[in-house]
Amino acid sequence: MKQLTRLWTLLILPCALAIGASGAAVQGMTSAVHHGASQTRARPQTLPTLAAYNLDWSNVAVAGISSGSDMATQLLYAHSSKIKGEATFAGSPFFCAQDDALDALYLCAGTEYGPVPVSTLEYDTDNASCIYMDCVSNLKGRYAWIFSGTLDSVVAQSVAKSAQTMDTFYGISATTNYTTAAEHGWVTPDVTTSCSTLGEPFLINCGFDAEQTFLTGLFGTLNARNNGTLSGKLIQFNQSPYAAFDMDSSAYVFVPANCASGSKCKLIVALHGCEMGQSFIGTQFVTESGLNEWADTNSIIVLYPQAIPDSTYNPYGCWDWWGYAGSNYSVSGGAQLSKIWAMMQRI
């Protein structure tokens, strides 16, 4: 617990303190957005635009780790009529932080504020349903793969389990893994970092292929993984037309060869966590996530949006799951969420 509190104090508490001790997190953060708060942007590059492909909208899913897990959940709930499911590592329930950085720290990562008030989150979600987001009735029959390691010192297992509780309330079919002795990280067979390791790049090997497991849950039976030279291409593209508060000027998309040639293809959006964007670990997440090898042989396009840090509200380049970019961060009109959705629609 001490390790959990220490790490999340580093990640989120500076954001809360920067806007005052009153706890009025959203108001301060939103004000900064509208008054031109400075951001650290990647150097502009001459890159291709994101291309359009022949997307099979019946097979669109999202995945993420930590803050990326929470953004994935926000996308699923906000666009439940289109997104069929999600895979999450170390995530929390939809709208868990409730526009408050301190709740994010002490309720949705640690447990100092007590258990997650799932019934309150469900009440708020019901009030937003069909107005600020797709109707929650669309969630019935969707799929969620939820992973939380027994050694995770950043996001408590009880938080991940509360996400399962909320998903089940809305009729989402959840498959869970709460028994692996894993620290806080994205589980992939493509790294040698031990399962119990905490720290950058937050990619860990736990002796099984998590991507095979959740991609099968999302899309059905898979062709064999390509363990050789990939026929598809990893493309760095200009994200600037889609970039909102704390989004980088470039991002990545992996496109299998047959998808580039016009075949109808599936899509999964893979969202990195804090300190995992390219400004921290380069292309490690986009090349070692374990997704591209399965995507190459299964007609799956993989979109890797990129977030960046700023010195005031988001020093570790997290996706917005507590309101630093505006109080509507978790619904369809959210600054980052709407831009990621625009990229998905472009594909």
Task: Name every feature range the model reports, one short phrase each.
Residues 23-46:
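Low-complexity, Pro/Ser/Thr-rich intrinsically disordered segments
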Residues 45-67, 77-83, 133-141, 258-262, ...:
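Gly/Ser-rich "nucleophile elbow"/oxyanion-hole loop immediately N-terminal to the catalytic nucleophile
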Residues 56-103, 223:
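Primarily recognizes the serine-hydrolase "nucleophile elbow" in alpha/beta-hydrolase
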Residues 94-171, 214, 255, 259-261:
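The feature captures the conserved acid-bearing segment of alpha/beta-hydrolase catalytic domains
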Residues 99-108, 192, 196-197, 276-285, ...:
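Cap/lid segment of the alpha/beta-hydrolase catalytic domain
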Residues 110-127, 221-262:
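N-terminal cap/lid segment of alpha/beta-hydrolase-fold proteins
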Residues 150-175, 180-182, 197-202, 281-304, ...:
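Active-site-adjacent alpha-helix of alpha/beta-hydrolase-fold enzymes
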